[in-house]
């Protein structure tokens, strides 16, 4: 059967593209970048989004997004927009205190592991470029993302969820504190307190937002199974044309 081109799917990819451009422009302006730097960040964003769009299409064709080849990327758009909003909020936070571990956790709830990895690193790249961060904060951000990627799959194990939430809190506090010590060569207790607040927010998102988004993703599967039984469903019409017996 032929590939179905769905207008809503194209619109949602376009909106994801606009969100990426928007967060890059906002971050660049808040970081007081020069015009040439803004243009450079815009070019990087366009390059990333072209690759991200192809990855979306590839993951959809493999039925990796909600086990649904006919997904319209609506859940991906919501997760991407939420991640962009969080990235803008992180711009106001002091160094070493941005709870970026929340990004892969949220994106994996609405999409796939691959999409979570790519989008999270994109948002962190925009964040660090806008803040003009030094190498230790970039490494701190990277370590938090890696921790988020590793913990994401564990959250599906509801029986041991409390232990994973404790682990998330500990990691989200210790990594910023350690990297800030490497940079300043002395302890900063204000960073400890702010990192603890960020860790608590990450825990809350893992405990409540992650399962909520996961249930929405599962509901998309149920809606898909209902839709394919309808007479006006596109692929069902194609099957009817192709083989009356199979229909």
Predicted regions and their residues:
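N-terminal membrane topogenic signal
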Residues: 2-17, 72-76
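Hydrophobic membrane-spanning alpha-helices of multi-pass integral membrane proteins
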Residues: 12-25, 78-84, 141-148, 164-180
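Hydrophobic alpha-helical transmembrane segments
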Residues: 14, 42, 76-81, 102, ...
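Membrane-helix interface and helix-disruption motif detector
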Residues: 29-42, 90-98, 129-138, 158-162, ...
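Hydrophobic transmembrane alpha-helices
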Residues: 31, 37-109
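Generic transmembrane alpha-helix motif of multi-pass integral membrane proteins
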Residues: 100-116, 150-155
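Acidic/His-rich, divalent-metal-binding segments that scaffold phosphate/diphosphate chemistry
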Residues: 120-122, 166-247
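Interfacial aromatic-anchored transmembrane helix boundaries in multi-pass membrane proteins
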Residues: 124-152
């Amino acid at each position: 059967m032929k590939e179905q081109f769905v207008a809503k799917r194209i619109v949602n990819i376009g909106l994801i593209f606009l969100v990426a451009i928007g967060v890059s422009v906002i971050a660049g302006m808040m970081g007081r970048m020069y015009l040439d730097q803004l243009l450079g960040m815009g070019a990087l964003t366009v390059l990333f989004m072209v690759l991200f769009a192809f990855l979306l299409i590839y993951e959809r064709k493999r039925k990796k997004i909600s086990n649904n080849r006919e997904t319209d990327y609506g859940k991906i758009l919501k997760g991407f927009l939420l991640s962009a909003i969080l990235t803008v909020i992180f711009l106001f936070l002091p160094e070493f205190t941005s709870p970026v571990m929340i990004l892969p956790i949220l994106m994996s709830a609405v999409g796939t592991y691959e999409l979570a990895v790519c989008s999270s690193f994109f948002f962190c790249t925009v964040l660090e470029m806008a803040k003009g961060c030094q190498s230790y904060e970039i490494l701190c951000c990277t370590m938090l993302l890696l921790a988020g990627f590793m913990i994401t799959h564990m959250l599906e194990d509801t029986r041991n969820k409390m232990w994973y939430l404790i682990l998330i809190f500990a990691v989200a506090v210790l990594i910023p504190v350690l990297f800030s010590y490497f940079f300043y060569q002395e302890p900063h207790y204000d960073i400890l307190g702010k990192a603890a607040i960020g860790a608590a927010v990450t825990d809350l998102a893992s405990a409540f937002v992650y399962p909520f988004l996961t249930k929405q993703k599962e509901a998309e599967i149920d809606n898909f199974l209902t839709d394919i039984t309808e007479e006006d469903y596109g692929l069902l019409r194609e099957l009817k044309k192709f083989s009356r017996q199979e229909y």
